[in-house]
Amino acid sequence: MVLSDAEWQLVLNIWAKVEADVAGHGQDILIRLFKGHPETLEKFDKFKHLKTEAEMKASEDLKKHGNTVLTALGGILKKKGHHEAELKPLAQSHATKHKIPIKYLEFISDAIIHVLHSRHPADFGADAQAAMNKALELFRKDIAAKYKELGFQG
């Protein structure tokens, strides 16, 4: 799967909006993930106690983790598909330490699309959404390949 230069530009244009508030976007995305797929919360020992959206919004740790997640994803997206060096340690930790199933990466991808659309409707139309979906699918496909190399059946 390859994105065109125009598709990558759409992805990076919306990502510039994310970078204006990485932690806030990340927190919103994690809240959307946890509300839509409560089973994902079980993978996060330090967030398991957060039961309500208000508790999640008040959590500085959740905001920090959202910042970490989106900072890593931004670094990967900026590589425009040439993300082998960035992907390897991420796949290693997510497969061997955290044991995050690929399905959960699909869930967070959906949360990313939803939050970007809700926060930036004028800048995240159908073309940009399609490009971001394609970029996230490429990321998941490449992570899945690394998982397989590591013997993780996520």
Curated annotation (Swiss-Prot):
Principal place of residence: cytoplasm
Positions with a binding annotation for O2: 65
Function: Monomeric heme protein which primary function is to store oxygen and facilitate its diffusion within muscle tissues. Reversibly binds oxygen through a pentacoordinated heme iron and enables its timely and efficient release as needed during periods of heightened demand. Depending on the oxidative conditions of tissues and cells, and in addition to its ability to bind oxygen, it also has a nitrite reductase activity whereby it regulates the production of bioactive nitric oxide.
CDD domains according to UniProt: Mb (cd08926)
Domain Globin, chain residue ranges per copy: 2-148
Protein name as catalogued: Myoglobin
Recorded GO CC terms: extracellular exosome; sarcoplasm
EC number(s) reported in the record: 1.7.-.-, 1.11.1.-
Reaction equations catalysed: Fe(III)-heme b-[protein] + nitric oxide + H2O = Fe(II)-heme b-[protein] + nitrite + 2 H(+); H2O2 + AH2 = A + 2 H2O
